Swiss-Prot record:
The gene is cyn-8. Its EC number is 5.2.1.8. Residues 235-254 have a biased composition (Basic residues). This is Peptidyl-prolyl cis-trans isomerase 8. It comes from Caenorhabditis elegans. Keywords: Coiled coil, Isomerase, Rotamase.
Amino acid sequence: MPPEVRGNKRAFFDISINGEPAGRIVFSLWNHCCPRTVENFRAFCTGELGKMNGHYASYQGSVFHRVIKGFMIQGGDITHGNGTGGYSIYGRTFDDENLALKHKKPYLLSMANRGPDTNGSQFFITSEEVPHLDGKHCVFGEVIKGVEVVKAIENLETGNEDKPVCKVEITHCGEMVRKGDVVGNAGAAASEPEPTGVKMEDEPKTRNWLMRYSKSPESREEKKKDKHGREEKRDRRRRSNDRHGRDRRSRSRSQSRDRNRRRDDRSGRDGRVGRNERDDRSGRDERRDDRRSAPTKDGIKVRGRGKLTFLGGRTRSTTPPHWKREESKKLTLEAHQKRQEELEERQKRAAQREKEEAERNARLEKERVERQNQRELERQKQEAERELKRQQENEESGNRRRRRSSRSGSENDESELEEPKNRSASPRKRSSSSSSSSSSGHSSDSD
């Protein structure tokens, strides 16, 4: 689905790493696919809802609390800052909206949750394709600018629970409006007719509401005449006031000189000043000196006619909290240099660890290859031994068969030799038997 079909809203984060500006991340929000989720994220970006649940409903000042290289960066915990808090603009949590969208490319904006229908304010930005999250987390936007900032956060050193060692803070955030929309609204406002005949340039330069023009339309000529007439009257009044003021000042100076002269004459006639008058005058002088050098609340004496009276009540507006936060981030040159040295030292340690890790991986790979070669040699040796043993067994079985065949052949030869002997022995037996019978006959005859 093309981006213009998914949504047309934009939001941004201004990121700082250890108090140093790192850049801006701009998001394209898919409000056509996930309107509730996008509205929740947009409201937290603008902070338009103010305070909710005892915390300001804004991502400003929150941190990225979890960073996993090759996977994602996670933030949005506006209450605790460690991944255990947060809430939504609809309540504690709200339901999953569109789980059909896939995590099929990097730098997608998705909602973090603790299970089905537990979306709050936490979110994460993927750095790789993560299909195992499909159907579990709602994708509602993507990064369209500031990929290098996401990579910089992803490559930070992390500690326990994948928390980055450096503080990654959202210093400013909000919604972006396209220029075409602003120009269109301005043109529409300019094309609207004015409700009255009074122009902005004809309004009087006074704050008194009762001295303003009436809203009835008048001709341009009459307005100019009235304007010139008022200016002439104002000039005449100013000149007369200046003249009367000079007269009053001159009369007051002459009267003060006359009073001083009469006082001096009386003092000359009396020859001395009474004790009570001296005491009153000294008391007035002391009180005047006290008023002139009255200390303020912080103990600083201010010279003048009296104490400062404009420090009593605070009538001005208070300093905005984000100004105070920015003011607290000011660093001295020594602190900045120390921070830079610590950063360089961490970078060196990280580079050293990477080097050691690469060496260890190379060593392990070499050992693995050697073990594999050794196993291959042992396997070949065992196969050679089995083949040799098989050959020896074959030779022994052949020898046994040959011996058996030779033995059977010799037995056959012996049996063949015994048969003629038996044949030759049988006539001898017959002849011996006949001779014995004849001898027995002869013996009987002789008897």
